[in-house]
């Protein structure tokens, strides 16, 4: 929370209540940093540097204090850290949080082009804010502005609590009904509440905001042969998965038996012995399953083959219809908007079960979209847009 003109110290109690709504996102730690014009709060899920990465994190350089609240992970943090050390920066922790704030001090907004990872963060310094979101918008970041007041949050519900009201935005609602469960980048279904767009950053100063884009997808002609393309994808997938194994807590994998999760499990098992894997099933699924064009059989035997091949420690979570129905409201509240009904509730329940033993789980959810493998993309009557033809974007 930031207010250029007004004293926010009388808002600490209310701010604390707002932050409490996010404790389920980060149950390991809960802290607030307050000053006259800025309140920063953080609920932490400890993954890297369990003791040294507490937030809000303060870093002092040239007698200027920088305070950051950060959600995400920078996979190439060690490379960036070595570069910063060579340039004279000092570190007191092993966390990527400190690397992010030091990178901003050293390079300004250009630091965002160095980060290979997923992130959203706010840095406060000299009564100014720098706010940023990762290239693909994996990590959420919402904001509200009225006059000199700005509120930022990972979830909309905190902003709604402060406002004490909920006004639906007509355009956002139309988009939700037409594009559901999504709306166009930057929009939400609530009036005056916005999402910072992926690959954008915001400077806030003197009660004003300035938003800029720092990265964009590039269109490039794809001239590689089939064999070269297979090799390239194999290298990229291996590199991506290996980077995401950076963790000070155990890592697990979701395993559905499909290509995506099976590949992730196979690669991960090269680096983690006796890997834990999880699958979800539904009560009486064997009785009611109906084969169709894109899934002719149940996935059980594929799961069995993969878990046996890689010798994983496997657990299947079985959900009942009643459980799915009963968790619909909770999944709706978690999303702060209507979503994908039973898909949301089943994923919520599945994730809860995994969280009893693991904080980190790798998933192949939506990975098939990268290579347009979903059936909606391969219908015979699907029209290929000229802009995408023969290109890798």
Cite the ranges covered by each PLM segment.
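Cysteine-centered catalytic environments shared across enzyme families
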Residues: 1-334, 347
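Active-site adenylate/phosphate-handling loop in enzymes that bind or generate adenylated species
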Residues: 135, 147, 259, 286, ...
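Long, Lys/Arg- and hydrophobic-enriched amphipathic alpha-helices
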Residues: 335-343
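Residue-level signal for short amphipathic helical patches enriched in basic/charged
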Residues: 75, 338, 357
């Amino acid at each position: 929370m930031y207010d250029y003109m007004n004293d926010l110290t009388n808002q600490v109690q209310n701010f604390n209540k707002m932050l409490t709504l996010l404790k389920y996102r980060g149950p390991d730690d809960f802290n607030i940093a307050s000053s006259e014009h800025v309140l920063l709060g953080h609920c932490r899920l400890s993954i890297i540097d369990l003791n040294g990465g507490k937030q809000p994190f303060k870093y002092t350089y040239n007698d200027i204090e920088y305070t950051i609240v950060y959600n995400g992970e920078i996979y190439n943090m060690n490379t960036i850290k070595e570069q910063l050390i060579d340039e004279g920066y000092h570190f007191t922790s092993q966390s990527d949080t400190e690397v992010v704030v030091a990178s901003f001090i050293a390079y300004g907004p250009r630091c965002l082009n160095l980060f290979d990872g997923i992130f959203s963060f706010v840095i406060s310094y000299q009564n100014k804010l720098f706010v940023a979101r990762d290239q693909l918008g994996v990590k959420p970041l919402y904001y509200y502005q009225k006059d000199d007041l700005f509120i930022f949050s990972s979830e909309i519900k905190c902003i709604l609590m402060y406002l004490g009201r909920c006004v639906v935005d007509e355009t956002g609602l139309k988009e939700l009904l037409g594009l559901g469960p999504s709306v166009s980048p930057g929009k939400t279904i609530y009036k005056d509440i916005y999402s910072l767009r992926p690959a954008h950053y915001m400077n806030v100063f003197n009660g004003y905001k300035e938003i800029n884009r720092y990265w964009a997808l590039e269109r490039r002609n794809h001239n590689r042969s089939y064999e070269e393309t297979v090799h390239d994808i194999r290298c990229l997938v291996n590199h991506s998965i290996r980077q995401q194994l950076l963790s000070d807590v155990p890592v697990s994998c979701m395993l559905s038996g499909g290509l995506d999760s099976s590949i992730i499990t196979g690669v991960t098992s090269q680096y983690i012995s006796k890997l834990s894997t999880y699958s979800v099933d539904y009560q009486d699924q064997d009785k009611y399953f109906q084969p169709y064009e894109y899934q002719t059989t149940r996935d059980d035997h594929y799961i069995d083959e993969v878990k046996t091949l890689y010798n994983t420690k496997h657990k299947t979570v079985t959900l009942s219809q009643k459980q799915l129905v009963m968790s619909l409201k909770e999944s709706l509240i978690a999303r702060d908007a209507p979503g994908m009904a039973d898909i949301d509730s089943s994923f919520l329940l599945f994730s809860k079960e995994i969280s009893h033993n693991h904080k980190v789980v790798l998933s192949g959810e939506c990975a098939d979209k990268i290579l347009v493998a979903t059936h909606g993309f391969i219908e015979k009557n699907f029209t290929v847009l000229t802009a995408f033809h023969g290109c890798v974007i």
